[in-house]
Amino acid sequence: MHITYDLPVAIDDIIEAKQRLAGRIYKTGMPRSNYFSERCKGEIFLKFENMQRTGSFKIRGAFNKLSSLTDAEKRKGVVACSAGNHAQGVSLSCAMLGIDGKVVMPKGAPKSKVAATCDYSAEVVLHGDNFNDTIAKVSEIVEMEGRIFIPPYDDPKVIAGQGTIGLEIMEDLYDVDNVIVPIGGGGLIAGIAVAIKSINPTIRVIGVQSENVHGMAASFHSGEITTHRTTGTLADGCDVSRPGNLTYEIVRELVDDIVLVSEDEIRNSMIALIQRNKVVTEGAGALACAALLSGKLDQYIQNRKTVSIISGGNIDLSRVSQITGFVDA
C-alpha cells in the first residue's frame, strides 16, 4: 500500500517510468563500502549511477520523457540544452527511439561531453557561454523548427524517470534509514523522494549542494524559491543557481534536510572514492559522499543504513589529474 501525496509526480508515475525503462537502462549496483562505513560509523551503500548508460542518471528522465511523447510529437523532433549529462541522455534516448534530436551546448562545454553527445546521435549546436544563452537558443529553435523541448529537470516525466532510482533502492535495501542525494535543479532528489516516501515515509531523504551554488538549499530553508550562486564549483553538473518550480514543490514537501559542502570537501570525496573504492566520479557525483565525510550528517547516519547516490562519472582525465594532484591545477 503506497502513500499518495498531492504533488506533480506520484508513485504510480514512477512505476510507469520503470516499465518504460525496462531493458533500456541498467539497474545499477549498490554495494556496501567498507571505507565509508568505517569512517561514518554506520552502514554506507553506494548507488553507482556513474556506471549507468551515458555515465549518469540523466538517461532515466530523458528516456522516460521521450518515450512518453505522442507519435506526432516524435515526428517533430526534440531539442534540449545542457553542458553535458542531460545532453548525452537525450542523445542516446533519441537514438534508441528513432527520434531526431538537437542539443544546444555552451561553447565552453567539455570536449569529451560534446563528442559523446555527437556520437550518441544528436546534432550538437554550440552557442553562448552560459545557461541563459543556451536556453535562448533553444527557444529560437522551438519557434523556428517546431521541435519539442526536453527540460533537464523541471518536468513530471523527467522527475518520474529519475525516481526509478528510489524504487531500485527499496528493492535492494528495504530497511534503509537514509538516502543522501546530490542536488542541482532538483529533478533527481524530487523523484527519489516521491518514490521513497510513498513506500516508507520514515526514511530520511537528505540533499547535498555546494556552498558556492545552492539555489535549492537557499529556497528550502527560506520557504520560497530564490537564487544563489557566488562562483563556480567542482560539482559543475549541479551548477544550477535556481531550482525548478515543480522540483522545489516536491522537495519542500518531502525532503528532510539539505546540507552544504565546501569545494575542499568535494575534492576530498572524489579522491576518497578513487583511492578507497576505485570509483571515478565527477564533482557532482561526489557531493553525497562529501557530506558523509564532512561529519555534517553524523546525527542521521551513525549506527544506521545509508545509501549515497553517486550520480555521475563524466569527467575529463585531465581534470582527474588536477584534482588528485598528479599535475598542477
From Swiss-Prot:
Entries under Pfam families matching the protein: PALP
InterPro entries, sorted: Ser/Thr_Dehydratase, Ser/Thr_deHydtase_PyrdxlP-BS, Thr_deHydtase_catblc, TrpB-like_PALP, TrpB-like_PALP_sf
Pathway annotation from the record: Amino-acid degradation; L-threonine degradation via propanoate pathway; propanoate from L-threonine: step 1/4
GO MF, any single term: threonine deaminase activity
Catalytic activity: L-threonine = 2-oxobutanoate + NH4(+); L-serine = pyruvate + NH4(+)
Enzyme nomenclature, EC number: 4.3.1.19, 4.3.1.17
Family statement: Belongs to the serine/threonine dehydratase family.
Protein name according to UniProt: L-threonine dehydratase catabolic TdcB
Organism (species): Escherichia coli (strain K12)
The gene coding this protein: tdcB
